[in-house]
Amino acid sequence: MSFDTTQSQSGVSVSLAVFVGLVLALFGSPLLGQLDIADRFSTTTTGSMLINSVSMWALVAAVFVVVRFWERRPLGSIGLEMPTRRQAAVGVGAGLGGLVLGMLATGIAVAAFSLEQPETLSTIAELSLPVKLAIVATGVITEEFLWRGYPIERLTELTGSLWIGGATSFIVFLAVHFPAWGIVGAIPQAVFALALVGVYLRTRNVVACILTHTVINVVMVLVLPAFL
């Protein structure tokens, strides 16, 4: 059942379900952050990060519920399908290319402006390997549903423009991550976000984006901190 509230110029009705889904996907993480759940239930860095990971999975579950039981649509409508070999290759290739460009841009900025590495990266480097793996798995999967698959597809339907969906995803993703990563972290994050949005616009497949994000996060979270 659809609860229509208004009508976009593209002729697609905006339902309450889609509105709720967009709020959950795009802004659910920072809204939960305002509740300080991690700090309330844990006094350690490891505990806080694991609680944050659980929160991200809960948001994805909520979005899935909206799609399947409120919108009554398949998860394929937000890009959850097995990728073709070409789509998988695009995902992996974009991850490698994004890494090279992101680290190059960061290196130039650090050298030019004497910037320091983000505190978040130093904090992650001190965690145990199992916790790092949990953080990587959470990030590469949940963030692609929340900031790529759902919002890009639904905003494209509402506006009639795939580019508006992609641009919104890019801007919100950067804004949400900026407080944790700061200026120096925002440089590679911008490159990575462009790569991830580009992969989704090209493939319309969230699994391809997960492959891109996996390549990036494995290097940035598991490999790079060991050399810093």
Task: Please place each PLM-identified region on the residue numbering.
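Juxtamembrane helix-loop-helix connectors linking adjacent transmembrane helices
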Residues: 37-51, 73-139, 157
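Structural motif
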Residues: 70, 80, 198-201
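Hydrophobic/aromatic residues in alpha-helical transmembrane segments
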Residues: 62, 71, 101, 105, ...
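Residue-level signature of transmembrane alpha-helical entry/exit and packing/kink sites
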Residues: 10-19, 45-56, 86-91, 128-132, ...
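Transmembrane helix-loop-helix hairpins at the membrane interface
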Residues: 28, 110-112, 117-228
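N-terminal, membrane-interfacial amphipathic/helix-forming hydrophobic leader that caps
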Residues: 1-77, 107, 221-228
